[in-house]
Amino acid sequence: MKTKMTALLAMSALVVVPAMAENEGHGNGSEANKPQGFRFFNNRLTIKPYVSLSYTYDSNIDTTHKATSDSIFLVSPGADFTWRGDRWELAGSLWYRYNAYCDYSDTMGENSYGESLTYKWTNVDNASGKGWNLLLAERYAMINQSDSLTANDGRGIWRDRQKVDVSGVLERRFTDRWHMDVQGQYNWLDYKNDTGKYAPLYGWSQYAAGLQAGYAASKWTDLLIAGGYSDYTQKRGKGYRNYSNDSEVWTVQAGLGTHATEKITYRVLAGASWLDYGGHSNADSGWTYSLSANWRMTRQFQLSALGSSYYQPSERSLGQAIKVSSLGLGASYLTLGDKMRLHADISYRHEEIVYNDRYLGHGNNFDEDLLSVRIGADYTLNRWMTVFANIDWQEDWCDDYKQYDYDRFRGTVGVRFHY
């Protein structure tokens, strides 16, 4: 679906907003305190390895109303790389995370790992504005039960899972004002289920395609219109014979964006989506939106926003579809000679049941809200070491099912060694 696809591509840019401020030159002496990495091919290829060590206190490790607490020690090695050409750039990351639970190591997951790649290419002529832009991205992650909405692609659901995202955008700029792009995406989500311990969760595979056209009336105003189609294939389960495992979503949206500004970028689309769930046509329809924005107010201070709404099959029940609405706001500030970065973000996610089979969805027919707030700081001691700390508050509430409500507090301190 176009809304979700656009949000995922925009997220790759917005998530790194604080990192952009940290990694750029900010005056005399700042370069000496930043990781330089290993450089090859006349500095076109840069590889930056790192190892993070941290301690976390978690007040609710399994995100339930019962609220069982534990302490967690984490070791996370990884590496980031960037390879630049004259008109292209290839960037990627590889990471591993080991969680050692003090009291519940026999039941809680320990290993998470993943990788990501992004390729950008352009031949747009600066004078005429004509040419092509290409963006390709992929990522894989195996994430253990330690789940947070504000970090590591968290979904607010406690369960081991694997996720694959592959996406691409090809844009044609006809002039410095007129442009059009086609988009494609594949997603795969799979949960590890042990029905002897807990109720199953259901993943899917998804194919999506979209088309967007725009006219840049000015650098502040890019008029946009977009349409998209998405097909979900949900994992089957017992009692699912009355439904096809395929669901379809159509989306039409229009809105505004920016074209060539440096300090302020935004993209806001709104429109309508239609859901056909499990072979049942016209299961639901409604308005949807997509939002991404970044405002670099000063060299040190930045604000960002990211949000979207979309339809999808439910993850907690068969015979059920939901509409997800989400919004995240973030801020980042550099101080102490650019050695310290202060950051804060707030994320909200609402899941509304829009289709429910009374038999298959029994006990799961409730809307759910998840709110997460995080504040943190990191301080670069030198080019080899950074210390960091953050606190994370998460609250979940479910309409008419108060036994599923929970809140969660996490506090983390750690050190990151880098080169």
For the regions a language model picked out, list residue spans one by one.
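Cleavable N-terminal export/targeting peptides
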Residues: 1-31
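Gram-negative and organellar
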Residues: 21-419
